[in-house]
């Protein structure tokens, strides 16, 4: 490990997420994938650990072709704590993603190594569930919101730096605890932007929603829009509404209407 990696004079990052990013299926994976590409481009050596320790194609091979070592398999799963301890002095930092994953690793890293930890929450779970509670009044959602609030603030307190994709989330965190080290970073999904586009948008037709339906708020948003808003639009404009996203439920699929 040391001879192979440190001889290159590059810093090594252990990047931990729930599984290898399925970058063509959901926004969180796309963001993760783009940041992995950026880290490699910036000269870091990246070791990627998916908490399910699965070899999933074509995604694992894509990372490996980028020069990222993916830690997977039953042998690695049984030795991950030993691996981290053995290589702690070779690693520059650990980048933990998502509260349900980060909470599995942060205590071991802080107690058994001197490594710096960056935590990226992807979204504030407690805020999302509290907003749903406000809509539904379901006390189970309030209980779940409080649970995630305790987890997320514990992680941010233990991490050396935390990131979220919006200033709204950062403001919410600082309203509760101004001392938390947290910043907003862009949900980075494109390598480059088109500066000049000759497309005549007046020729475009329809409305488009893009979002993975494994994320419940996306399904809620589409159902609400179709039932409450789209009929009002159709009274004035005969436009179509296109829904694009992975893992659509039967309820979402039932919205299909070619007419």
Protein language model annotation of sequence segments:
Residues 45-52, 119-121, 242-244:
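Short internal beta-strands
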Residues 8-25, 51-53, 75, 207-213:
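Nucleotide-activated donor-dependent transferases that construct or modify glycoconjugates
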Residues 22, 115, 119-146, 171, ...:
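Acceptor-binding helix/loop patch of EC 2.4 sugar-transfer enzymes
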Residues 1-29, 35-38, 59-66, 193:
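Non-catalytic membrane-proximal stalk/linker segments that position and tether the catalytic domains
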Residues 41-71, 75-78:
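N-terminal strand-loop element at the rim of the active site
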Residues 79-88, 196-199:
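Short amphipathic alpha-helix with an adjacent loop that forms part of the alpha/beta core around
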Residues 84-103, 118:
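Short N-terminal targeting/anchoring amphipathic segment
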Residues 24, 28-38, 48, 136, ...:
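Conserved catalytic-core segment of nucleotide-activated headgroup transferases in glycan assembly
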């Amino acid at each position: 490990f040391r001879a192979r990696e440190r001889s290159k004079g590059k810093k090594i990052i252990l990047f931990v997420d729930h599984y290898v990013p399925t970058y063509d299926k959901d926004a969180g994976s796309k963001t993760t994938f783009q940041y992995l590409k950026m880290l490699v481009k910036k000269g870091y050596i990246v070791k990627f650990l998916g908490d399910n320790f699965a070899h999933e194609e074509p995604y694992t091979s894509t990372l490996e072709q980028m020069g990222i070592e993916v830690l997977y398999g039953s042998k690695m799963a049984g030795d991950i704590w030993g691996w981290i301890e053995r290589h702690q002095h070779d690693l520059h930092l650990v980048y933990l993603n998502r509260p349900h994953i980060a909470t599995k690793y942060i205590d071991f890293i802080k107690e058994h190594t001197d490594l710096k930890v960056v935590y990226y929450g992807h979204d504030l779970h407690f805020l999302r569930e509290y907003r749903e509670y406000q809509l539904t009044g379901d006390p189970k959602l309030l209980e779940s919101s409080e649970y995630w609030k305790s987890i997320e603030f514990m992680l941010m307190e233990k991490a050396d730096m935390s990131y979220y994709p919006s200033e709204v989330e950062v403001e919410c965190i600082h309203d509760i605890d101004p001392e938390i080290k947290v910043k907003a970073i862009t949900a980075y999904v494109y390598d480059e932007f088109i500066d000049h586009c000759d497309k005549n948008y007046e020729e475009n037709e329809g409305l488009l929603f893009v979002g993975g339906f494994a994320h419940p708020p996306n399904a809620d948003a589409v159902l609400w829009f179709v039932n409450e808003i789209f009929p009002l639009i159709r009274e004035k404009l005969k436009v179509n509404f296109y829904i694009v996203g992975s893992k659509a439920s039967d309820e979402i699929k039932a919205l299909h209407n070619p007419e």
